[in-house]
Design a protein with these regions (language model features):
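Negatively charged sequence features
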Residues: 1-39
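Arginine/glycine-rich "motif VI" loop of SF2 helicases in the C-terminal RecA-like domain
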Residues: 64-68, 127, 163-170
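Short acidic-hydrophobic, aromatic-tinged amphipathic segments that line or gate anion-handling sites
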Residues: 197-204
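Catalytic core regions of nucleotide second-messenger enzymes
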Residues: 130-132
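Short glycine/serine/threonine/alanine-rich loop segments
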Residues: 71, 170, 196
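VWA/integrin I-like adhesion module and closely mimicked acidic/polar interface patches used
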Residues: 143-193
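Short beta-strand-loop
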Residues: 72-102, 119-127, 151-152, 183-193, ...
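Von Willebrand factor
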Residues: 29-89, 105, 111-117, 121, ...
Length: 225
């Protein structure tokens, strides 16, 4: 429905501009909806507060439509030396508002720990329903600074864990927030290891995140446009 009407629409950076009225569920998604898991870098790197605020906003937007679309959303943040499930997978906007009232940021970047935590949550979801195909959305600049142990390199740890997740062949988007003058391209390398769609954003926003999430689901046939 969206493709024939692209001319004249203002693009927000997606390959296909998607509006609410364009989205029609396939029969299975009408019954079950999609699961979106946000994995967010909340470390002391530039823009952490903006990232967290934008993800919180898009979580609320998705859940506001949950009665109609039956989508569920979860959120993991990583900072200092650990990753934390801030929002277990839910369809309740009231529950999300309670869990996401405070969004702490700062410290080192334990990217590998974040990926491990995401994989643990994915394992639980698959055990509940092997037919589920959750959408993982990783938001980071890729600059891991906290290793899994004293004798390993944090970037290599992260790339190794990214490759493990890539073996799942699931829909993944990596949103690169790197904004420094010298670009290391680590988030792009993560995306390659994960077999993920890659997006670089200069300024993160709720609308951009929502668009990327839906586009990633659409590319795997989970939205019918």
């Amino acid at each position: 429905a969206a493709a024939p009407h692209q001319k004249g629409r203002q693009s927000n950076g997606c390959a296909v501009v998607i509006r609410h009225e364009d989205i029609r569920r396939k029969e299975r998604e009408k019954r079950t909806g999609n699961i979106f898991l946000f994995l967010v870098d909340a470390s002391g790197s530039m823009g952490a507060r903006e990232r967290m605020k934008a993800v919180k906003g898009v979580v609320f937007k998705m859940l506001a439509d949950a009665y109609q679309k039956r989508d569920r959303v979860g959120m993991i943040a990583f900072r200092r030396d650990r990753a934390e499930v801030l929002l277990p997978i839910t369809r309740s906007i009231e529950f999300a508002q309670k869990k996401l009232a405070a969004l702490p940021t700062g410290g080192k970047t334990p990217l590998a720990q974040g990926l491990i935590k995401a994989e643990d949550m994915l394992d639980r979801l698959y055990r509940q329903d092997p037919l589920q195909d959750p959408v993982l959305i990783l938001i980071t600049d890729g600059r891991a600074t906290n290793s899994l142990n004293k004798n390993t390199d944090p970037v290599r740890d992260a790339l190794s864990e990214a490759e493990r997740i890539g073996h799942r062949h699931m829909p993944i988007a990596v949103i690169d927030t790197e904004s420094s003058f010298i670009k290391l391209g680590l988030a792009k390398e993560l995306a390659q290891k994960m077999g993920a769609s890659y997006f670089h954003v200069d300024k993160i926003s709720e609308d951009r995140l929502l668009c990327i999430g839906r586009q990633t689901a659409y590319e795997r046939g989970q939205y019918d446009l």
